[in-house]
């Protein structure tokens, strides 16, 4: 059976691994997943990530905890295959008053909502993280 939404699968694997208090979660790799992992690392939501394997690359994400609780409290998919959400730069959502981040796919790459506003570009709102 083919996977319809690989990014939603990635987010679900991260949520499930954090509920089970795992230190590392592994999944099939793709360019989009690596870009989202890079944004999560840059924003301090995960400890690190690594791509391994040549023929079938695998993405391993090292999860981050603070005082025994996961750093990521909420991880939600916004745009999905059945209902894409494209937003102009002025319409980009602020997550919990700016405490969280939206991850946006723009023509200049995958970035946070803050970086997209600074660059003056809109795009597809992939997910929100808090």
From Swiss-Prot:
Keywords recorded for this protein, A-Z: Ribonucleoprotein, Ribosomal protein, RNA-binding, rRNA-binding
Record's keyword annotation contains RNA-binding: yes
One GO cellular component term: ribosome
A single BP term in Gene Ontology: translation
GO molecular function, one term: rRNA binding
Top-rank taxon, per record: Bacteria
Record InterPro entries: Ribosomal_uS8, Ribosomal_uS8_CS, Ribosomal_uS8_sf
PROSITE patterns: RIBOSOMAL_S8
Subunit structure: Part of the 30S ribosomal subunit. Contacts proteins S5 and S12.
Function: One of the primary rRNA binding proteins, it binds directly to 16S rRNA central domain where it helps coordinate assembly of the platform of the 30S subunit.
NCBIfam families listed in its UniProt record: PRK00136.1 (NF001109)
Homology family: Belongs to the universal ribosomal protein uS8 family.
Protein name: Small ribosomal subunit protein uS8
């Amino acid at each position: 059976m083919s996977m319809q939404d690989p990014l939603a699968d990635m987010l679900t694997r991260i949520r499930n691994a954090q509920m089970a208090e795992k230190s590392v979660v592994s999944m099939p790799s793709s360019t989009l997943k690596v870009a989202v992992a890079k944004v999560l690392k840059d924003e301090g939501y995960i400890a690190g990530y690594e791509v391994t394997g040549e023929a079938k690359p695998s993405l391993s994400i090292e999860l981050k905890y603070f005082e025994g609780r996961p750093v990521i409290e909420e991880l939600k998919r916004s745009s999905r295959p059945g209902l894409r959400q494209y937003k102009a730069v002025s319409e980009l959502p602020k997550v919990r008053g700016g405490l969280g981040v939206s991850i946006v796919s723009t023509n200049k790459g995958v970035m946070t909502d803050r970086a997209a506003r600074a660059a003056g570009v809109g795009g597809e709102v992939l997910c929100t993280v808090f």
